[in-house]
């Protein structure tokens, strides 16, 4: 099993006054004692500096943290990460909103978006979004994010990936620089690679601009057969419609929809001949002066997981929606 010492080398123990912008570091911890030791010190620094701090972890971590903080817990905001970050594409917008709520002030965050029990697909997307955090926030406002990794519950692949996506690693009460960090220009593109093939034979439906209405009907009927309730079925219809509309507008006038089921999860994938080049597409809240990305923003809000792969030969967007 890798440890933090395998991934880092000496650096200053704390952020100098000259350092500005986004400080993205990981904390490898073992057991509840390790979790509390690392997070309490980080939060105490924020409270001492009167910096707003948001802790986004699982509910099982919140209770011991609150108990250890005592009265200082009232000075900390908490979010349930399995709800907030079920789809990791919601995390960058959530942190951006936290920054906006405290405009002009340094802030801190504690995040555990990668936890034991995440599916392989979820872990892959979490790792991609951890890298995108650097692109989204580097060179911007001053804030620090401490990302937690459970050495007892995560495999070596997840631990290694953390070193590639985080420039700093918490160590001995300070931090070290990650020797394996891949900065801009070195990290793989956010949409590189291929999705694994469907786990079962999918239903395939070709579509063009004239087919969007019957396509919605087809998806609604299929979702009902997949045991989605009315509200979740409509979420799936909305997501597929947004993706298909994007294919019509930007992907060559049409595309191919694949639908299948994996356990309790309904899967839909839209393929077309377009290429997605904006790495943060769908990760910014739409505004009247920035209408682009609205479709993928909506898809990210209503789906449990969204996977995007794109190259010159075309794009594929796969969405997951659990039936329970």
Task: List each language-model region with its residue ranges.
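Amphipathic alpha-helical segments that form the core helices of the histone-fold
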Residues: 44, 240-244
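Non-catalytic regulatory/interaction regions at protein termini and inter-domain linkers
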Residues: 1-202, 206, 217, 225, ...
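A short beta-loop-alpha structural element at the N-terminal edge
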Residues: 206-212
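Conserved beta-strand-loop-beta-strand hairpin that lines the nucleotide-binding pocket
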Residues: 193-196, 202, 245-324
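Short aromatic/hydrophobic contact patches that present stacked aromatics
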Residues: 27, 237, 316-318
């Amino acid at each position: 099993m890798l440890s933090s010492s395998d991934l880092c080398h000496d650096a200053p123990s704390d952020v100098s006054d000259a350092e500005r912008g986004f400080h993205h570091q990981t904390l490898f911890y073992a057991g509840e004692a390790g979790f509390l030791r690392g997070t309490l010190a980080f939060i105490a620094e924020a409270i001492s500096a009167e910096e707003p701090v948001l802790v986004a972890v699982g509910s099982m971590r919140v209770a011991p943290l609150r108990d250890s903080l005592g009265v200082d817990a009232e000075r900390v905001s908490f979010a349930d990460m399995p709800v907030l970050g079920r789809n990791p594409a919601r995390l960058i917008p959530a942190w951006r909103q936290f920054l906006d709520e405290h405009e002009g002030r340094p802030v801190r965050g504690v995040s555990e978006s990668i936890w034991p029990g995440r599916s392989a697909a979820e872990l892959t997307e979490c790792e991609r979004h951890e890298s995108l955090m650097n692109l989204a926030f580097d060179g911007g406002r001053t804030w620090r994010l401490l990302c937690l990794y459970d050495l007892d519950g995560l495999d070596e692949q997840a631990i290694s990936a953390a070193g590639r996506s985080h420039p700093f690693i918490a160590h001995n009460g300070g931090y070290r620089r990650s020797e394996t960090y891949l900065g801009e220009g070195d990290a793989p593109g956010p949409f590189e690679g291929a999705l694994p093939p469907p786990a079962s034979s999918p239903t395939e439906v070709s579509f063009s601009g004239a087919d969007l209405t019957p396509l919605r009907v087809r998806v609604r009927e299929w979702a009902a057969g997949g045991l989605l309730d009315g509200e979740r079925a409509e979420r799936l219809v909305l997501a597929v419609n947004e993706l298909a509309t994007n294919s019509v507008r930007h992907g060559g006038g049409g595309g191919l929809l694949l639908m299948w089921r994996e356990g309790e999860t309904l899967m839909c994938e839209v393929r077309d001949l377009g290429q997605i080049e904006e790495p943060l597409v769908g990760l910014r809240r739409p505004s009247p002066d920035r209408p682009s990305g609205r479709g993928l923003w909506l898809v990210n809000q209503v789906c449990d997981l969204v996977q995007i792969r794109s190259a010159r030969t075309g794009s594929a967007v796969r969405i997951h929606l659990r039936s329970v």
